[in-house]
Amino acid sequence: MTRSDELFEQAKKTIPGGVNSPVRAFSGVGGSPRFIEKADGAYIFDADGKKYIDYVGSWGPMILGHNHPKIREAVLKAVENGLSFGAPTELEITMAEKVIEMVPSIEQVRMVSSGTEATMSAIRLARGFTNRDKILKFEGCYHGHADCLLVKAGSGALTLGQPSSPGIPEDFAKHTLTATYNDLDSVKAIFEQYPEEISCIIIEPVAGNMNCIPPIDGFLQGLRAICDQYGALMIIDEVMTGFRVSKSGAQGHYGVTPDLTTLGKVIGGGMPVGAFGGRKDVMQFIAPTGPVYQAGTLSGNPIAMSAGLAQMEALCEEGVYEQLAAKTQYIAEGFKAAANKHGIPMAINYVGGMFGFFFTSEETVTNFAQVTKCDTALFAEFYHMMLDEGVYLAPSAYEAGFLSLAHGEEELEATLAAADRVFAKLAKA
């Protein structure tokens, strides 16, 4: 039994399932999760001292790599002045100005402590601003664990949503409508049925919780037009894609302007943080200037703001996103080439610093229905073989992979060599 095995058994005695977020339990791939002791650059190290090339990056925020000296120094300097004040700080202003500078659609921004807080607050604001109750989300997209967002599609294309978790009353879920990602016709049909009841559309511009599904050409622009036609707000959830896909997020990459944007992960440099922002007239509707209530004791925490600012400043340096995109393309296409070499059917998607691969015979994967038909058993086998090779991928066939600037030629080549060996073994099985 490894030290990680021992820790997992110990954790299950005091923590539900032994983890503090379900995907960490390895339920999607089987076996025991690796308990991590430290991380540096492109690597993480488990409790048994084993070193892995990391393609999870704490689920996205580690764009510069783990334990980056600029972020570490910013945190240590901030700690000297105290941990939390529950009062305004100049750091909050500096962070707000930096976000607004980088994302043109954001005119004002409110800091919170998590991505879930950001999406939950943005939806409440959209409902209050429009005086409408219903929201529209997309099948396979994840926006945090607020009650109104843990909803799946009903039994027909135009039926009301059904709770996807116990503990959510159907009275809550009925206000959440679910459309098909990358299918404008499904969105139009729902708006035609509820033309004056939908407050907002919320969408991951690149769906990162059904692996990695970019929008097809014109999809985001079509959603913008539908929102304008029916007087609904468009919320782009950039908790995962913000400052990872491009300097101005996925919205900048694809050329679409939302009314509200949610952010998280990246703007904390690895610290717990989130934010939502957008049009000034909408943001002025939030307390204390408006009637929609939102608050948080740790919102704008000085340690998180310091870490985030250090990362954001580094991301503004010349050539950062070109490097990140090139590395991501190289690893994704390398996986595909290795799979093809050994006759393993695989499709790939990638954009900016995100990538995904799917064990399927389909050439392209563009929606949740296709994702659910992929070979998850083969993924689990591939996952553990790569883990044995010292490559740490997301432990679920439904999660995206992430590159960092710390991933160099050595790490990329070692990863692809490992993939080649694993695919060769799978082909013989």
Swiss-Prot record:
The modification N6-(pyridoxal phosphate)lysine is found at K265. GO terms for molecular function: glutamate-1-semialdehyde 2,1-aminomutase activity; pyridoxal phosphate binding; transaminase activity. Its EC number is 5.4.3.8. One of its GO terms (biological process) is protoporphyrinogen IX biosynthetic process. The keyword Cytoplasm applies. It is found in: Cytoplasm. Its cofactor is pyridoxal 5'-phosphate. Homodimer. This is Glutamate-1-semialdehyde 2,1-aminomutase.
